[in-house]
């Protein structure tokens, strides 16, 4: 986010006590979505999540587990959402979730705090530095 922007849009953290974050988020009125291959399929749930998120005071907190996620997260998240019910990478789960939440419009978001931006090319690459 330092280079490509999005600080006002996203917050990414590695934390020592993720359970504390989830508890606090929910206590403050936030919605927690846990991405897991064991959850309800995203296409069956995305409309409900989108509608529900509008009734909460905080933005969505997305929890993405790895191989050995504690059962606690399955019971303390508002939604357990499956991005397919086969093993997959955490990054791909987040990408698909964001695509569904933003209905594909995330491809056209331009962050005002970006230090660089890309001009799409059929061949080669073109990156332009901003004055930020």
From Swiss-Prot:
Q: Cite the EC number.
A: 2.1.1.206
One MF term in GO for this entry?
Answer: tRNA (cytidine(56)-2'-O)-methyltransferase activity
Protein purpose = Specifically catalyzes the AdoMet-dependent 2'-O-ribose methylation of cytidine at position 56 in tRNAs.
**Keywords on this record?**
Cytoplasm, Methyltransferase, S-adenosyl-L-methionine, Transferase, tRNA processing
Localization, per the record, is:
Cytoplasm
Binding sites annotated in the UniProt record for S-adenosyl-L-methionine? 35, 65-69, 83-90
GO cellular component term of the entry, any: cytoplasm
Organism of origin: Sulfolobus acidocaldarius (strain ATCC 33909 / DSM 639 / JCM 8929 / NBRC 15157 / NCIMB 11770)
| UniProt record, GO biological process | tRNA nucleoside ribose methylation
Q: Which family is it part of?
A: Belongs to the aTrm56 family.
| Catalysed reactions listed for this entry | cytidine(56) in tRNA + S-adenosyl-L-methionine = 2'-O-methylcytidine(56) in tRNA + S-adenosyl-L-homocysteine + H(+)
Its main subcellular localisation, reduced to a broad class, is cytoplasm
The record, for Pfam families, names: Trm56
Q: What is this protein called?
A: tRNA (cytidine(56)-2'-O)-methyltransferase
- Indicate the quaternary assembly: Homodimer.
